[in-house]
């Protein structure tokens, strides 16, 4: 252990009504940066909010080498993945989800009347790779309303 002084980073607060749009976006999954390189001195972490409107379903995408942890803050959602996005996980308020690196997926809101809000964290950053011309299966979704 050394007694050499080290430069400490500053603590900071990002106000909810001042959050910037995150650099990586996907249609119908609007990301806002909370703790990020755009708003703080953080290195190797992105933490923000993701909004999906009533009945909306995102385009297919993945997050490169980033590991993603999500928390359903408000509403009910689903994530589709796997071959032709035929596998589905359902989530409700208070649930956590892990999305491994490079896994293509689609996020959706299970309600046609309420907004879905996720709290999402990624390491090392908010990497978003949108996937075009994907073969997406037509499956039944268990909407809540």
Language-model features and meaning:
Residues 57, 66-93, 103:
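A short beta-strand-loop-beta hairpin characteristic of the jelly-roll/cupin
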Residues 1-44, 59, 131-145:
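A short, N-terminal "cap"/entry segment at the start of jelly-roll beta-barrel domains
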Residues 49, 62, 81-83, 109, ...:
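Residue-level recognition of conserved beta-strand positions in structured domain cores
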Residues 40-42, 84-86, 112-115:
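Short, solvent-exposed loop/turn segments that connect beta-strands within catalytic domains
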Residues 44-45, 63, 91, 110-112:
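Short glycine/proline-enriched turns and hinge-like loops at secondary-structure junctions
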Residues 92-93, 101-128:
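Ligand-binding loop in jelly-roll beta-barrel domains
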Residues 50-58:
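Short, well-structured hydrophobic secondary-structure segments
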């Amino acid at each position: 252990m050394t007694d050499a002084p080290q430069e400490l980073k500053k603590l900071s607060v990002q106000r909810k009504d001042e959050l910037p749009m995150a650099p990586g976006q996907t249609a119908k999954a609007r990301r806002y940066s909370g703790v990020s390189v755009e708003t703080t001195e953080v290195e190797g972490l992105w933490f923000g909010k993701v909004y999906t409107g009533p009945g909306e379903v995102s385009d297919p995408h993945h997050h490169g080498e980033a590991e993603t942890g999500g928390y359903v803050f408000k509403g009910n959602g689903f994530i589709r993945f796997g071959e032709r996005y035929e596998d589905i996980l359902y989530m409700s308020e208070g649930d956590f989800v892990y999305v491994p690196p490079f896994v293509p997926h689609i996020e959706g809101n299970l309600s046609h009347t309420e907004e879905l809000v996720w709290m999402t964290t990624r390491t090392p950053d908010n990497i978003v790779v949108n996937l075009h011309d994907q073969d997406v299966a037509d499956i039944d979704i268990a909407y809540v309303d």
